[in-house]
């Protein structure tokens, strides 16, 4: 995988595909039994929620706002979730699930290649957040108002991502490829540079920076920072 286009061809992260996974995860509580109907309405609900949250904040968004913008009745909404907190956890849970699914499966050929694995992690994380941009902005911007369960899930996901980066760094140090005195701290410093892409994407776009260019520049910067020894 060398480009955003390659990544998107490999992973179906369309709104419909993501909502199909939400339906699968919450099938026991969603009361709509026809999958096609349920997925279509979930897509309307989630897309409207992400749009409203970006405009006025999730905390300030009411279910009435959601009914007006989605075109679904209050009763229809309650067929999918019983409260705003449940809706929030459905969205956040999908973000966390995709992160684990996509980043947790590096190519087998990188098992003994920590430098390649680090590049893959950085590039894949960036392409993932670009593809699911509204979802990640929602998770980042709304974190302060999450209920405890949501905050715990968000922190666990962030620590998981940092752990993957730290593991690649530690492997590289062991093999004499990286010069990093503290891999956990290094991973914690790298993570905000990944987040900067989706939190401040408009700034980068104004500068003409594409996702592929940002990925290449970020990788070059990180490799220099960790003292990659070219073999």
PLM-predicted stretches and their roles:
Residues 19, 130-149, 203:
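Amphipathic alpha-helical segments used for helix-helix packing
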Residues 94-104, 128, 149-175, 184-188, ...:
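Amphipathic alpha-helical packing segments from all-alpha helical-bundle domains
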Residues 52-86:
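Helix-turn-helix
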Residues 127-131, 167, 171, 187-209, ...:
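Amphipathic C-terminal alpha-helical segment
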Residues 31-32, 38-65:
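Short, amphipathic alpha-helix enriched in basic
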Residues 43-47, 59, 80-104, 162:
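An amphipathic alpha-helix adjacent to DNA-recognition modules
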Residues 1-38, 231:
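N-terminal intrinsically disordered/low-complexity leader segments
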Residues 105-134, 187-190, 215:
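Hydrophobic alpha-helical connector segments
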């Amino acid at each position: 995988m060398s480009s955003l286009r390659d990544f998107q061809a490999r992973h179906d992260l369309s709104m419909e595909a993501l909502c199909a996974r939400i339906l699968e995860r919450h099938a026991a509580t969603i009361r709509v039994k026809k999958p096609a109907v349920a997925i279509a309405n979930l897509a309307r609900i989630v897309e409207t929620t992400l749009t409203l949250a970006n405009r006025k904040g999730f905390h300030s968004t009411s279910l009435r706002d959601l009914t007006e913008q989605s075109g679904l009745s209050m009763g229809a909404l309650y067929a999918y979730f019983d409260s705003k907190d449940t809706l929030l956890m459905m969205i956040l849970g999908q973000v966390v699930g995709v992160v684990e699914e996509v980043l947790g499966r590096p190519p087998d050929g990188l098992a003994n290649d920590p430098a390649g694995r680090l590049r893959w992690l950085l590039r894949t994380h960036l392409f993932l957040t670009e593809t699911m941009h509204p979802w990640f902005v929602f998770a980042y911007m709304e974190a302060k108002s999450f209920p405890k369960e949501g905050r715990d899930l968000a922190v666990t996901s962030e620590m998981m991502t940092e752990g993957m980066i730290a593991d690649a760094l530690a492997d590289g140090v062991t093999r004499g490829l990286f010069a990093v005195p503290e891999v956990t701290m290094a991973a914690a410093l790298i993570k905000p540079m990944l987040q900067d892409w989706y939190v401040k994407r408009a700034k980068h776009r104004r500068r003409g920076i594409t996702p592929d260019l940002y990925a290449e520049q970020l990788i070059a910067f990180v490799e220099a920072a960790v003292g990659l020894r070219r073999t």
